[in-house]
Each structure stands twice: as C-alpha cells, then as structure tokens.
Amino acid sequence: MDSNKAAAVEIIGKLQEEGHVAYLAGGCVRDMLRGETPKDYDIATSALPEQITSIFSKTREVGVHFGVVIVIKDNQAFDVATFRNDGSYKDGRHPEDVTFSTPEEDTARRDFTINGIFFDPISQKHIDFVDGRSDIEKKVVRAIGDPDLRFQEDHLRPVSYTHLRAHETRED
C-alpha cells in the first residue's frame, strides 16, 4: 500500500473509532477501481469540521464553510469533508451555502457517477448509490442528475467531462 493511501486509511480508522462514518471519496476511488494509483486521497465523513479539528492535532481550516478541513498526516495533506448538500451556485464554481447531510445526499451533489463512489478501506466495501462502478466497467462518463444543471453549477465540469471521456476512450 502506498504511503498516501496508508495515511488516508489511518485517518478514516481514527474517524470511525470516534463513532463517525468515513470513506475514501471521489476520484481516488475511481482511479483504484481502474487499477491506477491515485494522485491524492479525499475523505468524506459524517464528522463536522469542529469534530475533525478536535480529533486530529494537525489541521488547517481552509474550507470550513463548505465542511472541508485539511488533516496533516505523515507530512501529507488530506481533504476531509463533511457529507453535504450544496445550495445554489453563485459564481459558476462555488455553492452559496451548504447543509451537512448523509452519504447518499452527498453523492447526489457530485458531478459524475464514476466520481460518486465511496470506499470504506476498513470493511473493504464500496458504497455506490449511482451505479458508478458499472459505468467504470462500461467506460461511460455520466452526470449525476441533470447534466445541464451539473454543468451550469460548476463551469469546470465540462472540462472535467472532456478529460474523463478522453481517458475512458483511449486505447490500451
């Protein structure tokens, strides 16, 4: 196991020991399912930002309004985000407000099904509310919900879509 993943698993283990739900989330799960080594590991949790900062001694509060705290482990930085719903988007990039929620509701706000999968490295189980694993197998990039709305919310999503489509259709 690479050192980044090992540190992420330790963070998740500590959150779970404290009674919180915690998973690997997003692109790192997608990459692992593709057999690739992720560049970074994001963590999604039921812990609120103030709980995250009380559990871990080395943190940076960079996006607390959005439920994101950076946890430093073994000189590596990990985004640890509270499960959330996003409100309306004000600038084509960031939601005006967020409310903390459940894993299923958190998945519904994400961009593409292949990025909407959680993985619990402690139990070795995938949590997939949007059939993202099937889309990875079929090499399909599909928006979660209404694609037009997803692209309007965040103006970088069409770029992400193009990048992901290029990856999915390349010849091996």
Language-model segments: what does each one mean?
Residues 1-170:
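Catalytic cores of the polymerase beta-like nucleotidyltransferase superfamily
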